């Protein structure tokens, strides 16, 4: 019989790290065990939740709170909710944690140099050149979580490996059962005492020069993933001139 415990999995990280891909993968597997699942993707819900809004810090936080409000309603009604959202500011994420309750935070991390390399849209390079203003991680800071339940390094770990971490955390917190996960993964998983491993990142890093250099040379210096998540490039002078969206 399907479990009815609702919960929210909030996937945060810079644009292009793989949050939406991970959310879709998790949702498909939860549906295998008859879970009611909803994905609240900030990009897909643009017209409904933030049409006409700009990219200021307050406006971004308003979007995060709106997604959190909807996620909270669904969670209370026994829905498994997955929210892939850049959500760059820690205070808004923590507010959602408090109000939603049954909540796990997943930090999907990837070095900015890698994001630039694999960005087929060219948005990162445009942001570095000043063509796209208010781009998180380039001209605006991203605040990495200090104690996310799950950290996924998407440049090093596969979707399956990252999903395994999320399923383990859901099991540890009692949001899914070992029987469900045996159907999903084919393995017998055991709950472990939940622990939070702090992510050793600067809590409010500022953009720097590293990614701009990487964009020109195509090479980046080695570093722990997301040590440069927000240490990337100086804000371009053109950035303040427009309010074009860049998610």
Q: What annotation goes with each model-predicted range?
A:
Residues 179-247:
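Polybasic, lysine-enriched low-complexity intrinsically disordered terminal tails
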Residues 21-72, 76:
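Conserved substrate/cofactor phosphate-moiety recognition/catalytic segment
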Residues 1-6:
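Phosphate-binding P-loop
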Residues 18:
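Conserved glycine(s) of the Walker
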Residues 11:
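Hydrophobic anchor at the beta1->P-loop junction of P-loop NTPases
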């Amino acid at each position: 019989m399907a479990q009815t415990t609702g919960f929210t999995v909030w996937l945060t990280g810079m644009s292009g790290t793989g949050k939406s891909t991970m959310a879709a993968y998790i949702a498909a597997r939860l549906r295998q065990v008859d879970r009611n699942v909803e994905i609240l993707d900030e990009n897909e819900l643009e017209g409904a939740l933030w049409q006409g809004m700009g990219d200021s810090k307050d406006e971004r936080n308003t979007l995060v709170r709106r997604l959190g409000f909807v996620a909270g309603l669904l969670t209370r009604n026994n829905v498994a909710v997955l929210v892939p959202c850049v959500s760059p500011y820690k205070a808004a994420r923590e507010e959602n944690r408090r109000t939603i309750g049954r909540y796990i935070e997943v930090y999907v991390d990837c070095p900015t140099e890698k994001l630039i390399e694999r960005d087929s849209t060219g948005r990162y390079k445009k942001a570095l050149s000043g063509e796209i203003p208010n781009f998180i991680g380039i001209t605006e800071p991203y605040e990495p979580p200090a104690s996310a339940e799950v950290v996924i390094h998407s440049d090093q770990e596969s979707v399956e490996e990252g999903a395994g971490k999320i399923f383990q955390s859901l099991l540890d917190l009692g949001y899914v059962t070992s029987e469900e996960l045996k159907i999903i993964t084919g393995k017998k998983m055991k709950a472990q005492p939940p622990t939070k491993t702090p992510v050793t990142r600067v809590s409010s890093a500022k953009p720097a020069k590293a990614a701009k250099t990487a964009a020109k040379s195509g090479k980046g210096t080695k570093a722990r993933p997301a040590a440069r998540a927000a240490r990337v490039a100086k804000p371009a002078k053109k950035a303040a001139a427009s309010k074009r969206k860049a998610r």
